[in-house]
Amino acid sequence: ASTMAGQMLNVIVDNMNNTVRAQVLEGYKEKGGTLTTDQAAKLVTPIVKNVKNMNEVGKNSANGNSPISLFQPLWIASLASAAIIFIAISKMPVSSRKENFLLKVNQIVTGAIATLVIGFGLTWIADGMVGLNISNFTDTALFLSITSFSFFLMISAVLSLVGLKGIGLFALLLFFGAPLLSLASEMLSPFYQDWVYSWLPMKFMIEGLREIFFF
């Protein structure tokens, strides 16, 4: 989006330069005046543009797409952990409501531990091994852990209702949602903004990471 805005501004300034140059030369021509070397040099670019980037993405940020780079492995890890824990829990015998309740609590606690490992592990891999620019390790790791736990709870709830068939739904969300998340919402059509992008559960992760990384 920033690249497109910069290109548009460059075209606008270039058109203004051409218009001003033509008007000034036409005025000199009507008056029969002549131009000095300095005046001619200034007429080449009568309007000088000074570009200053705000909230620059910095180095080693995947050209500003580091939130998207972190989303995909986090989503897949959350989906895999929810599926594995669900399969393990579903095979355990339950004879009473109390045992079923304790089993659900155990599922949530196990998921919380798994998502902590996912959040801190992914941040460590991205920072130490991949080399992404992560200015605040702890905030990023905690945010990813909370996000992963939220994904885990959502996926587990769906799996408890429809079974392992629900995994296909979240795979489709990854397949169709990731391309939309890489675009600025202003670049989407009103339909996608209101009925697709606003309903993507992972958009909150992308927006949160952008706040942590770039603002």
Q: Residue locations for each model-derived region?
A:
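A generic alpha-helix surface/boundary motif
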Residues: K31-G32, G119, F152
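Membrane-water interface at loop-to-transmembrane-helix junctions
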Residues: N63-F71, K98-I113, S135, L161
